[in-house]
């Protein structure tokens, strides 16, 4: 089947789905391409981002964390967005696309619950019926977000199969969509999955990097030495990276979760420690066994607990344009505490991985003058109970 947009990033990407879903993906691609050229669609999307979601988000300079170093560190404050994370950006775009296609229902999957909350709020706003698949384990560890979704009228469906986490929720959501695509839109939550989702999600998140570029030029008069973002599926990172890819003097650093340590096998770092396979409708690196079964990923942060990664990140990694590193649970926890204590900002555990790498860069080169931007992709309200229990068990509180 020919496509309007290139479905691949190098060798990665594609549309590996049952034949029954091909018409739905084709319809989605056509709607997206026409919407991108439609001034009325763009005006409505921009208006929602500004007057409902609260864009542009701030670029905040850290006053205290950089003490004793020559680093200047800024945070792109996606945590200030309505809904609490960057997820709100692209769901507003997808919800408008769903309406454009005449769909009346939204299907979504969620890990940390942030995409679920965003899907629920966009559905409530635009009058769409919403059902959200969530791994049973994540339902337990993200109870505040589950209640938020239900409060906004969404049906939350716990998934008990497999590892009862995000990958299983993704499978159930796709299964649902294959039987209901005529009236339902699958609102995929990250820059992964079958074409055209990775491209759609990137384009509906790219304002993160566009705003950052304008803001840093205004504040510092130059581009940053590096932009840093956490990577699960990769939507906040590709949103930050997209406008900087051509700026080859700006480093792009994606941070995967090392969990209990790469050597433990309990991590979520497929880019550096997985191998290429087919999963979730795409060809991309993933964590898999010797016989090709998808391995369980692990991270303290539910939103990074995903065994694969978006195909554009795989491409940027393969070409060397972006560097991908990993941060352990403990390092992310330390960054979570440090930002809370020294800047009065409680970050999501996902975003804490990106911050932890920036802090590591500062510590390793205290005399190096460097201008860094971390994408603070979400706020940590949803994680305070998880962190509280860990710190209590350690006797730190």
Swiss-Prot record:
Q: Tell me if Transmembrane helix is a UniProt keyword of this record.
A: no
Signal peptide residues are: none
Q: What Enzyme Commission number does this protein have?
A: 4.2.1.20
Pfam families per UniProt: PALP
Question: What are the required cofactors?
Answer: pyridoxal 5'-phosphate
Q: By its UniProt entry, which SUPFAM superfamilies does this protein fall under?
A: Tryptophan synthase beta subunit-like PLP-dependent enzymes
Q: Which GO terms describe its molecular function?
A: tryptophan synthase activity
* Family annotation (CDD domains): Trp-synth_B (cd06446)
> N6-(pyridoxal phosphate)lysine: which positions carry it?
87
Report the pathway entry.
Amino-acid biosynthesis; L-tryptophan biosynthesis; L-tryptophan from chorismate: step 5/5
GO cellular component terms listed in the entry, alphabetical order: cytoplasm
List, alphabetically, the PROSITE patterns matched: TRP_SYNTHASE_BETA (PS00168)
| Reaction catalysed by this enzyme | (1S,2R)-1-C-(indol-3-yl)glycerol 3-phosphate + L-serine = D-glyceraldehyde 3-phosphate + L-tryptophan + H2O
EC class, as a word, reads lyase
Q: Keywords assigned by UniProt?
A: Amino-acid biosynthesis, Aromatic amino acid biosynthesis, Lyase, Pyridoxal phosphate, Tryptophan biosynthesis
The record's section on InterPro entries has: Trp_synth_b_CS, Trp_synth_beta, Trp_synth_beta/beta-like, TrpB-like_PALP, TrpB-like_PALP_sf
Q: What function does this protein fulfil?
A: The beta subunit is responsible for the synthesis of L-tryptophan from indole and L-serine.
* Family, as annotated: Belongs to the TrpB family.
Q: Subunit notes for this chain?
A: Tetramer of two alpha and two beta chains.
- What is the name of this protein? Tryptophan synthase beta chain
The organism named in the record is Klebsiella pneumoniae subsp. pneumoniae (strain ATCC 700721 / MGH 78578)
């Amino acid at each position: 089947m020919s496509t309007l947009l290139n479905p691949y990033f190098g060798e990665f990407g594609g549309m590996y789905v049952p034949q029954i879903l091909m018409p739905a993906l084709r319809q989605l691609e056509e709607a997206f391409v026409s919407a991108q050229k439609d001034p009325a669609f763009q005006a409505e999307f921009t208006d929602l981002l500004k007057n409902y979601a609260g864009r542009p988000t701030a670029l905040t300079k850290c006053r205290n964390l950089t003490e004793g170093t020559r680093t200047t560190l800024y945070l792109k404050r996606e945590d200030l967005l309505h809904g609490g994370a960057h997820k709100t950006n692209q769901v507003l775009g997808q919800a408008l696309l769903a309406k454009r296609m005449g769909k009346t229902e939204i299907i979504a999957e969620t890990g940390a619950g942030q995409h679920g909350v965003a899907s629920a709020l966009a559905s409530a706003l635009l009058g769409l019926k919403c059902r959200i698949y969530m791994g049973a384990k994540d339902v337990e560890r993200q109870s505040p977000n589950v209640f938020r979704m239900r409060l906004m009228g969404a049906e939350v469906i716990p998934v008990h199969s497999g590892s009862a986490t995000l990958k299983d929720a993704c499978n159930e959501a796709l299964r649902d969509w294959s039987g209901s695509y005529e009236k339902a839109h699958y609102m995929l939550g990250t820059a992964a999955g079958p074409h055209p989702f990775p491209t759609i999600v990137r384009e509906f998140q790219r304002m993160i990097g566009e705003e950052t570029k304008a803001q840093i030029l205004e504040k510092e008069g130059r581009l940053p030495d590096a932009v840093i973002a956490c990577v699960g599926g990769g939507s906040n990172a590709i949103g930050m990276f997209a406008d900087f890819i051509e700026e080859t003097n700006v480093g792009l650093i994606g941070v995967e979760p090392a969990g209990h340590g790469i050597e433990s096998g309990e991590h979520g770092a497929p880019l550096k420690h997985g191998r290429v396979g087919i999963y979730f409708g795409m060809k991309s690196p993933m964590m898999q066994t010797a016989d090709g079964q998808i391995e369980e990923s692990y991270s303290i942060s539910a939103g990074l607990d995903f065994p694969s990664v978006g195909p554009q990140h795989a491409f940027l990694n393969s070409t060397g344009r972006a560097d991908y590193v990993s941060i352990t649970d403990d390092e992310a926890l330390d960054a979570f505490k440090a930002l809370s204590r020294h800047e009065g900002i409680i970050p999501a555990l996902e975003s804490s991985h990106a911050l932890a790498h920036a802090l590591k860069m500062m510590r390793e080169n205290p005399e190096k003058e460097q201008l860094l931007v971390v994408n603070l992709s979400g706020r940590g309200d949803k994680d305070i109970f998880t962190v509280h229990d860990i710190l209590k068990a350690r006797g730190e509180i």
